[in-house]
Amino acid sequence: MKKNIFLFYCFLAMMAASLKAQEIRPMPADSAYGVVHISVCNLREEGKFTSGMSTQALLGMPVKVLQYNGWYEIQTPDDYIGWVHRMVITPMSKERYDEWNRAEKIVVTSHYGFAYEKPDESSQPVSDVVAGNRLKWEGSKGHFYQVSYPDGRKAYLSKSISQPEAEWRASLKQDVESIIETAYSMMGIPYLWAGTSSKGVDCSGLVRTVLFMHDIIIPRDASQQAYVGEHIDIAPDFSNVKRGDLVFFGRKATAERKEGISHVGIYLGNKQFIHALGDVHVSSMNPADQNYDEFNTKRLLFAVRFLPYINKEKGMNTTNKNPFYQ
């Protein structure tokens, strides 16, 4: 009997501890900032693994930490808010966060790779890395950069898949043709709902990821991307749409309701566009083409020209102009 009573009270104590852990609490001032310390972390709508994924954040990305309940509610540089597991970011004071932002970085420029314990690709991996990951630059050794993670881990990153951030920015091209070339480099990467990395992308995540590889941040969702930059009502012959414009698809507007945006791609010219649906591939809006996409052609809405508006319009900027990176 006494044993049963003891077990009952143990159960109550565990339940109380569990409820306390789930209680949402504001973050203390000394840890209201943070930096992602895994290659790709998943943001969810709620603080639990069964909740839907809403977007992703990348290694080295600075974030604001808003609340805590065993998970962290964070805000990313594109102002997206979601919940991440406590094991994927390093909370920081404003002072440490500023130090991280000021430090020289190494940027991963290849779609995928690994960082190693030693300057030797046959040594133990420390983690995987993807394009756009940023790590603190600690030095160089042969064909490797010595780097450190936000959580203090040390590693070596091959110079063949990475570049010092300042050098990368100086050599970076942000013109239409360079951006389209990057989009083509992602051909065949699988579709992943809420994905924004080389591991997998959704339609707006493809746009977001391609541009981030050119140091450009734009709104996360297609429904947000559709209303920045210059709106273009597409001519029947597509003569007013340029390579690099974004083309949007969805439910057409009626007298009773506004259009509904549900898909986006990057226009390539000649009625061709690259997009993520199943995987990243090129489709056509010309019925005579072998890759004709009847489904999306019938729900084509309009185009947006965005490149001339980077750093000139709210929500579209390079990282050196984004307040999260300052």
Give residue ranges: language-model regions:
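Aromatic- and glycine-rich peptidoglycan recognition patches
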Residues: 121-123, 163, 260-326
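Beta-loop motif signature
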Residues: 26-29, 35-65, 108-137, 191
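Soluble non-cytosolic domains of exported or imported proteins
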Residues: 51-54, 123-126, 173-177, 197-202
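...with weaker cross-activation on analogous glycine-rich loops/strands in unrelated enzymes
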Residues: 218-282, 288
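Active-site nucleophilic cysteine motif
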Residues: 183, 195-214
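Bacterial Sec-dependent N-terminal signal peptides
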Residues: 1-27
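Boundary regions of SH3-family modules and the immediately adjacent low-complexity/disordered segments
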Residues: 22-31, 62, 76-110, 120, ...
